[in-house]
């Protein structure tokens, strides 16, 4: 099997993290070299930036500052972890990537998708995923899931009002339309077992 850069996207509470935790052992059993990582984060520098981005008390953070911090974390994560893994023929499963910035900062924050895309083109040197799975869910459903997850730490973005989260979903749907050649929309409001089966099939079809 060959390596592949796969990103998992979706609004808050869409089940990205749970999905990736289930995909990892599945592909390991198939003797596919596989690695799971996340954005912002995945390596020390980017995890430190994540801490800054998620601090609840930093409500004064300006939208451009936010976008640039995400891009900085993305750059370091890409060159330090993702690219070396792809060179070693790994299947890389990444929780969020550039599409999150387009939906959250580009659309929901109002910076403009084209501007945010250009920032990230500079950061990534046009290194894009081969496949993106977008987990679509109504904001009310996703936020309700978060509310029931006692073990999940509430971050700054979780504290935004419902109108912000609705804009995030609207932004994602525009991103899906814009990059339909690499993004597959999957309904996240279904039992996790069915969701895993559907996503496994999509990834395996791409690996062949």
Curated annotation (Swiss-Prot):
EC annotation from Swiss-Prot or TrEMBL: 2.7.4.9
Binding site residues for ATP: 10-17
Reaction(s) the record says it catalyses: dTMP + ATP = dTDP + ADP
CDD domains attached to this UniProt entry: TMPK
UniProtKB keywords: ATP-binding, Kinase, Nucleotide biosynthesis, Nucleotide-binding, Transferase
One of the record's GO cellular component terms: cytosol
Record-level Gene Ontology MF annotations: ATP binding; dTMP kinase activity
GO process annotations (BP): dTDP biosynthetic process; dTTP biosynthetic process; dUDP biosynthetic process
InterPro entries, per database record: P-loop_NTPase (IPR027417), Thymidylate_kin-like_dom (IPR039430), Thymidylate_kin_CS (IPR018095), Thymidylate_kinase (IPR018094)
Record has Disulfide bond as a keyword: no
UniProt KW ATP-binding keyword: yes
Family, per entry: Belongs to the thymidylate kinase family.
Function: Phosphorylation of dTMP to form dTDP in both de novo and salvage pathways of dTTP synthesis.
Protein name: Thymidylate kinase
Protein's organism: Bacillus mycoides (strain KBAB4) (Bacillus weihenstephanensis)
